[in-house]
């Protein structure tokens, strides 16, 4: 009986050790890590320096960019685009000078320039090492990485991020969308 208890105890210890090593080899879940970084950035927003820029040519009715910096690093950029039939806000989040997350919210107006929001759509984009690793579409479902538009959206978002970071760091009070 004692031998059985010892064998079971040893086996459980070996299995627990193997499971811990397997989890350590995989590393932490990148989505969970990004969510924690996102929350930490938003908690610290009041302490960050803000840089405001006017956005020209990105939307019909203009726009505004606000960059939040911690020391020399940009940790968040909020770009708001105004249009006749709605308003869109893109929030870009950065860790170690790398894009990690974009939250896009589009508020649709019931009538032109009314300001009365009748519908809102949201998209969430998760990045790791300059690659889009997850996209949660406006229906709340994950968009497949093999979907035809996935690579195009990734390229467009990375280009926008670079343009906004470069614009926020420039001395120019405006950022222009040059086709």
Question: Where are the regions that the model predicts?
Answer:
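Sec/Tat signal peptide C-region and signal peptidase I cleavage site
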Residues: 18-22
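N-terminal secretory signal peptides
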Residues: 23-84
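Short, surface-exposed coil-to-beta transition loops
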Residues: 61-64, 85-90, 117-122
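Mid-length scaffold segments of soluble, non-membrane domains
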Residues: 74-76, 81-103
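C-terminal partner/receptor-binding element of secreted or periplasmic proteins
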Residues: 129-179
């Amino acid at each position: 009986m004692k031998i059985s208890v010892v064998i079971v105890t040893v086996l459980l210890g070996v299995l627990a050790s193997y499971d811990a090593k397997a989890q350590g080899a995989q590393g932490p879940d990148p989505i969970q890590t990004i969510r924690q970084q996102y929350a930490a950035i938003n908690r610290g927003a009041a302490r960050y320096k803000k840089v405001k820029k006017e956005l020209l040519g990105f939307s019909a009715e203009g726009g505004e960019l606000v960059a939040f910096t911690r020391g020399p690093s940009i940790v968040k950029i909020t770009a708001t685009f105004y249009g006749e039939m709605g308003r869109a806000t893109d929030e870009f989040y950065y860790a170690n000078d790398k894009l990690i997350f974009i939250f896009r919210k589009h508020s649709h107006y019931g009538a032109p320039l009314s300001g009365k929001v009748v519908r809102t759509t949201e998209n969430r984009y998760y990045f790791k090492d300059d690659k889009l690793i997850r996209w949660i579409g406006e229906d709340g479902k994950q968009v497949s990485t093999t979907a035809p538009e996935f690579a195009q959206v990734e390229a467009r978002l990375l280009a926008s991020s670079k343009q906004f970071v470069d614009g926020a760091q420039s001395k120019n009070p405006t950022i222009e969308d040059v086709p």
